[in-house]
Structure formats: C-alpha cells, structure tokens
C-alpha cells in the first residue's frame, strides 16, 4: 500500500486467501517439509481473472496444481486426484459442477465459491451428490468472498467478465428500468462486500447525494449492518487470515460517481502505466504487443502498421515497472537507456574476466592476477541469473516503450497532452482549438474528439450555437463520429442544473527542452521532436474530494456528502461526528469506471502524507477508447 507498510496490502490479503484455498482451505505454510499434495484447479472465467494477476503458473505448481482447467472446457476424468473448484455460484456453473459429480471426474471435490452461494443452489449440489453417490467425495464447500480483482498493492477493480453490466453506459442509460438498476447496484455491492471481508475491516462510508454512488452506499451499509448483527456468522470477527488487522483505526470508504469528472478519462496522459493502458492493449497487468513493421510508409497522423503478437506481464517483481510506472514518459525512455548501458558494462566485465582467465604464461604477475580475478569471476558468475533477469526486463521495457513512442510520434500525443492540460487548468492557449482539430498531421479522429470533449466539459460557458456548428463541421471533416458529443451535451445540461462543473486546479506542464541524454545517437529511442514535459502535481477532482473527507476539511464540494457507519445501532443518516480526527486509511471507489490517470494522481498525492494509505477501486477500468465507445452508444439513444 502507498505509505508505510503498517498493514497487509489488499494484494497480499487476497493472495494469502487464494493460497489457503488452494491448500484445501488450510493456511499455507511457506517452506513446509514434504511434497505438496498434487491436485487440479478448475475455475471459470471469473476465477481465472482473479487468480492470474496474483499467482504465476510457477507459483501454482509450487502449491501442487498440476493442471488448471476452465470449468466449461472438455475435461477428461482423473479419478485419483482431488479437484479444487473456484467458480461463481451461477446457474450454469452449478449445473456443470453437478454433471462433474455424476461423471465421477475426480477423487474428491473442494468447492469454493467466489461469492456466497444461495441455500437453494447448495441444495441442488447436495441432491446431485446424493444421486451420484458422491456425498463422501465432496470434501469441503466454502464461500470465499473474493469477488474482485486486485491489480496493484493499492488498486482493485470489480470484474472483467460481464463488465458491461456495471459499466458507465449501463448505469447512465436513459431507458434503464428500476429492476435493472437494482441488479447493477447489487452486483457492485456484492463485490465491495467481498472486498471488505478480505480486508477485514468495516469502513465509515461517505458518498455524494442523488447519484448511483449513493445507491451503492445505502445498499452496502445495509449489507454490512446485517452481517455485523448476526454475531455468530459475522465475517468481521477475528482476523481469519492471520495477517494483522488493517489498523486500529477504521478506514474511510469514499464512494464517488464517475459523473463528477468526465474529462479525466478522456485525457491524453504522459505517465508510463497510463500511456501503456491508453495506447496499447493492456489488460489485467498483461500487455499484448504486435511487433511493429515501422511507420515508414504510413501517412503522418496514422497509427503505425502492425504484425506478430507478443505478450508481456508487468508484475510487482518487475523492479523497473514498479519504479517507473508513474514516471513521465521521457524519464522512462532515459532510464531504459541507462539500464541498458549498465547491463552492457556488467556483461563486458564478465567477458573481460573470462579472457583474462584464459591467460597463458607462467610469470608471477599473471598468476597473482589470476587468483585475484578468480574471486571476481566467481562473484560475476553468481550474479549471472540476476544479469539475465535484468536483460529480460530491459528487452521487455525497450519493446513496450518503443511501441508507446511510436504512438506518441505518429499521433503527436505530447501536443495533445500539453494542450488539454492548459484547457483543464484554464491557462491561455497558444493555438486555437480549431487549428488543432483541423491539423491533418495531428492525431486520429478519436484524439481530436477527446480533445474537443475535454474543452466542452471544462468550459464554464458552453460555446455558442454558431461556434459549436463550426467545431462540429471541423470534427466531421476530420472523420469524427459526433455521437459522444450528443451525450456530453445532454450530460452538461443536466450537470449544470445539479451542480457546478468540476474544477481541475491550476496545473501547468513545463516543457524542459528536449532530453539531452535520450537524444544521443546511441540511444534506443529517437525522441526527436517529442517534448520533454515535466508534470506538476495537481489534484484531480477525485483526489480533491478524498483529501477533503480524509482530512475532515470543510468544503462546499463535500460538505453535504452523506455519512454512514454500519457499526452504529441506528441507521439514520447521522451528521458527521464533530470530534472526528482525520483518517489514516481510505478507499476511494468510483462507481461507473476508473482509469490509471486518477490512480496515479492518488498515488502522487499520498506520497507526501506520512503514514497514510489509500486504495483506489472502480467498477471497471477503461481507457479513453473504451470510454468514448460507451459515450457514443449513449449519444445514439
């Protein structure tokens, strides 16, 4: 977690819970003597998405998992091996599970449900086990409460499968029925409940009024309250994971609605992780690259040509990624270059020592040199695995950063980033918006649309009809689809009635001149023409709201936020206790989808706060392309 390591992070907790489950629900002891029990793991797509960012195939093998298979794939019987199931308790999954029992596929069955299973479905399994004469083989049935995906020490999303169900579009559809909305809210609340069970803490909840976030808050408060009231079955007594409580103070949960800030998800970004997510295929911590054939013959402004797929996992053990995922891109390019140079120096040293070791000659100088170098070579050889790992990471980040750089150069993303920052901070613009939209060399139609929407959202005063027509013509001429603008117009009119538009603070990005080091001809990265923009910390709306509530600051933006304490006997919306001290731990959850720009902004904000922790969560994580698609669908209604 960002801040001091006072408590187990959510990644640690979910990993511990998964390892315990794979160990037949007995706490997993590291370095325990003897071989692990060999077993098969059967999961559905939900289970796969939860496990894959946390446990590698090697870690699964170390836990005794010889085979991991999808529940709905064709599976042969392996009758002398126990099977650990990790699935959602859906109708279709339960049917398949019962079929497995009837077909007597495995020696024994350890059934783990990602989310709590209902009594009626449990009875279906019991009946199937009876009919198949397999009651004794069903060894354990567990509700795991793990229905969320952890992507970072301090970041989680609700789901990846069926995410359309909880998407921004689903929540904001004008024709959504009350029943459909209930289903969406219940899905979100179920996952958040699982999150807090895994965290082992009951939060204080704050949320804005009259939004989907408020509906989530009311339902979550009720669900936590009911669980706490049932003392015998409460999931919050004791610490089942034995990893030490979150901390003595309860965490704050801030539920915000995506509608408080629609500009940030459309923003062109400048930090490494957010750029990778924006321009590449980055999904559950894995980036899929198509090896480029270069951009020679493509017209300027077009995306580079592509071929050959390759995928890389960007994991917590990747030191370079952990250190630089929040860095501005030119800094990343420079660091890759430095790593490469230091690796080459180490490699040359090993080669030099090897050649010295092959020295002929009997003279004493050579002999003493030999003994001196033996020690050096021994140390060099022992650091060889480390060297090879370093090489692997350098190659990985060279490929990923090069792919990002191709997009930056082909689409002039540095220009977009700088221009949007100026719009959002109300700084004087050095070039008219129409010029940027009309420039055939700058960006794709989608880049232009993103820029215009940010301008439209951030403007205190909407442009006049005459001006708007002019912009629309320029956008259409540039090949843009205007559906997203249709929706944003309606949204802005509605938001204006509800409240004032979000302000983005007065940020500036300072161009620092081009990077001298990366500009060297020996560099992997030809950064020519790319601005070396340096970021100044500014709080985005979500960070500002969190800051107000975490530090108990009085601010018109958050003063009317509702307050829920599920541990209080009466559930009236009591006003905030006056004598509250600031919170040390907080979870910000965005109903309607989040992004890596917001996540990075929170990480940067908390760096300056000693001993405080923040977690960022969202119903889904989307990049600007995916978000524009949702806005477009809403605009076509």
UniProtKB/Swiss-Prot annotation:
Presence of keyword Protein transport: yes
GO cellular component: cis-Golgi network; endoplasmic reticulum membrane; Golgi cisterna membrane; Golgi membrane; Golgi-associated vesicle
Phosphoserine: residues carrying this PTM: 32, 298, 523
Compartments, record wording: Cytoplasm; Endoplasmic reticulum membrane; Golgi apparatus, Golgi stack membrane
InterPro entries from the UniProt entry: Sec-1-like_dom1, Sec-1-like_dom3a, Sec1-like, Sec1-like_dom2, Sec1-like_sf
One BP term from GO: response to toxic substance
Pfam families given in the database record: Sec1
Keywords assigned: Cytoplasm, Endoplasmic reticulum, ER-Golgi transport, Golgi apparatus, Membrane, Phosphoprotein, Protein transport, Transport
Tissues showing expression: Highly expressed in testis. Detected at lower levels in brain, astrocytes, heart and small intestine.
Entry keyword Endoplasmic reticulum: yes
Main subcellular localisation: cytoplasm
Membrane topology category: Peripheral membrane protein
Molecular function GO terms recorded: protein-containing complex binding; syntaxin binding
Induction per the UniProt record: Up-regulated in astrocytes upon reoxygenation after hypoxia.
Function comment: Plays a role in SNARE-pin assembly and Golgi-to-ER retrograde transport via its interaction with COG4. Involved in vesicular transport between the endoplasmic reticulum and the Golgi.
Entry similarity comment: Belongs to the STXBP/unc-18/SEC1 family.
Quaternary structure (record): Interacts with STX17. Interacts with the COG complex via COG4. Interacts with STX5A.
Protein name: Sec1 family domain-containing protein 1
Origin species: Rattus norvegicus
């Amino acid at each position: 977690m960002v801040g001091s390591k006072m408590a187990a992070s959510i990644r640690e907790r979910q990993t511990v819970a998964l390892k315990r489950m794979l160990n037949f629900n007995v706490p997993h002891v590291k370095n325990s003597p003897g071989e692990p029990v060999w077993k098969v793991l059967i999961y559905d797509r939900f289970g796969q998405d939860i496990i894959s960012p946390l446990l590698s195939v090697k870690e699964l093998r170390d836990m005794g998992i010889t085979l991991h298979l999808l529940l709905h794939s064709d599976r042969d019987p392996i009758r002398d091996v126990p099977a650990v199931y990790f699935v959602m308790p859906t109708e279709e999954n339960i049917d398949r599970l019962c079929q497995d029992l009837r077909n007597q596929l495995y020696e024994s069955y350890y059934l783990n449900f990602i989310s709590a299973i209902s009594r009626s479905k449990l009875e279906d399994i019991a009946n199937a086990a009876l009919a198949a004469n397999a009651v004794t083989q069903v060894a354990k049935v567990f509700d795991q409460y793990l229905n969320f995906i952890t992507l970072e020490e301090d970041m989680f999303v609700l789901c990846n499968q069926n995410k359309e169900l909880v998407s921004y579009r689903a929540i904001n559809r004008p024709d959504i029925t009350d029943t459909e909305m209930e289903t969406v809210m219940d899905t979100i609340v179920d996952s958040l409940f699982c999150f807090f069970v895994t965290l082992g803490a009951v939060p204080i909840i704050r949320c804005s009024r009259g939004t989907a976030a408020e509906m989530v808050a009311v339902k979550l408060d009720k669900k936590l309250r009911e669980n706490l009231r049932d003392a015998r079955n409460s999931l919050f007594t004791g610490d089942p994971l034995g990893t030490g409580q979150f901390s003595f103070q309860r965490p704050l949960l801030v539920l915000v609605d995506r509608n408080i800030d629609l500009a940030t998800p459309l923003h062109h970004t400048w930090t490494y992780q957010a750029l990778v997510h924006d321009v590449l295929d980055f999904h559950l911590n894995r980036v899929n690259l198509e090896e480029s054939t270069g951009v020679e013959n493509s017209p300027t402004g077009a995306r580079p040509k592509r071929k050959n797929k390759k995928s890389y996992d960007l994991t917590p053990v990747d030191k370079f990624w952990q250190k630089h995922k929040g860095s501005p891109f030119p800094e990343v390019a420079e660091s890759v270059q430095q790593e490469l140079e230091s690796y080459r120096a180490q490699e040359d040293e090993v080669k030099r020592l090897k050649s010295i070791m092959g020295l002929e000659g009997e003279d004493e100088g050579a002999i003493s040199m030999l003994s001196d170098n033996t020690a050096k070579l021994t140390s060099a050889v022992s650091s060889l695995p480390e060297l090879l790992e370093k090489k692997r990471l350098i190659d990985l980040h060279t490929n990923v950063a090069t792919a990002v750089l191709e997009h930056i150069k082909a689409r002039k993303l540095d220009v977009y980033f700088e221009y949007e920052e100026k719009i959002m901070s109300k700084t004087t613009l050095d070039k008219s918006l129409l010029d940027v939209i009309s420039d055939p060399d700058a960006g794709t139609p989608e880049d232009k649309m993103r820029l215009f929407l940010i301008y439209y959202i951030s403007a205190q005063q909407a442009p006049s009809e005459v001006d708007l027509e002019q912009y629309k013509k320029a956008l259409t001429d540039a090949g843009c689809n205007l559906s997203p603008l249709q929706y944003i117009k309606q949204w802005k009119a509605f938001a204006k009635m509800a409240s004032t538009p979000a302000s983005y603070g007065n940020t500036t990005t300072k161009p620092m001149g081009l990077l001298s080091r990366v500009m060297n001809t020996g560099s992997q990265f030809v950064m020519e023409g790319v601005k070396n923009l340096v970021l100044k910390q500014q709080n985005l709306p979500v960070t500002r709201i969190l800051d107000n509530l975490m530090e108990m600051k009085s601010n018109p933006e958050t003063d009317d936020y509702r307050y829920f304490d599920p541990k209080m006997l009466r559930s009236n919306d009591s006003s905030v206790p006056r004598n509250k001290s600031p919170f040390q731990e907080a979870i910000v959850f965005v109903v309607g989808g989040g992004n890596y720009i917001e996540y990075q902004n929170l990480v940067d904000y908390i760096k300056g706060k000693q001993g405080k922790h923040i977690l960022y969560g969202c119903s889904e994580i989307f990049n600007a392309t995916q978000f524009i698609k949702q806005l477009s669908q809403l605009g076509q209604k």
